[in-house]
């Protein structure tokens, strides 16, 4: 029994990336060797997607309400330039993702029998739908997966509880922690679920499906590379008026590489703090901006949400006009700020963005499952971009403030 327990503990504490890779390889091998065997394990993928579908609405509602209710009062005003950079950078990432999706449209191999989309006519219908989703009954919003309504009621409850007693806030913080633990447990089952998903995908659609995933992954990585090597340096140059690349490459090397392998912005906070100290930044500033950046500076997440959502829209045959794409950029940017600290957080917020286009929760969750399949690389690159940008923008704001003082 002890041996079994230790084996389970080793599996639970092992590298999720390696386990997912094993699941993908095992699924491909099974589909190659035995098509019937691959089809028989498809239920593992369905169970995994079902668990995600069940927990996601509760997760969004509780996390949003708890984070707003427990927000610190009297935040330092000298954080404003950095916060503006964080938000602008996240929105820029979403816009970059929209442009990449328009230039290199992607479609996915999804099962569309279960639910069909009712595509919106344009921005007017999208806004009309959005307004009525906002005022949906909160219980119904959770039951039906109406993420716009969930987000609205979560924000409303969080604001209402912002002035509540500390004990009430602590209850919400504890519930939020509990839900996050449940999500982590479900994510630990990802290798088994992905094994079932990959087996079923290759058994039913053949190996042509991987071409779609490779195209999607290349578009995602290209958008993140453009953000890291072109957009971020341009933003930094605007602030510091000198060559930004020495700073950018230092941050990518010393923060981005570590974050790529840890796949956690929160886990990379100590690394970023040490880098800020090495860069001789103001401790009073970076001690606040780095943890804040791990929460709201989510350019990589905005790219993931936008590209996967537009891939879903393309797959469903929905024509996306420019104004709707801009609205998606805003929604993706705001949603990305809520992706922090949640395992697979950016993927679980895809249904919220998909709801803008009338895409059903069933189809959206299949897109989330595709995200988990490519997540071995996508999530690592996303975290590397997010975390390194925290230091880049903090350093740029500090240098700009110093230059202004010395002028």
Swiss-Prot record:
Its recorded reaction(s) are:
L-serine(in) + Na(+)(in) = L-serine(out) + Na(+)(out); L-threonine(in) + Na(+)(in) = L-threonine(out) + Na(+)(out)
- Which keywords belong to this entry? Amino-acid transport, Cell inner membrane, Cell membrane, Membrane, Symport, Transmembrane, Transmembrane helix, Transport
Q: Does the keyword Cell inner membrane apply?
A: yes
- GO cellular component annotations, sorted alphabetically? plasma membrane
Gene Ontology biological process terms, A to Z: serine transport; threonine transport
Listed transmembrane segments: 14-34, 48-68, 82-102, 141-161, 192-212, 216-236, 290-310, 316-336, 363-383
Q: Name one GO molecular function term.
A: neutral L-amino acid:sodium symporter activity
In the bilayer, the protein is annotated as: Multi-pass membrane protein
Q: Which InterPro entries match?
A: Na-dicarboxylate_symporter, Na:dicarbo_symporter_sf, Ser_Thr_transp_SstT
What does this gene product do? Involved in the import of serine and threonine into the cell, with the concomitant import of sodium (symport system).
- What family, per the record? Belongs to the dicarboxylate/amino acid:cation symporter (DAACS) (TC 2.A.23) family.
Name of the protein described by the UniProt record: Serine/threonine transporter SstT
Lineage at the top is: Bacteria, Pseudomonadati, Pseudomonadota, Gammaproteobacteria, Alteromonadales
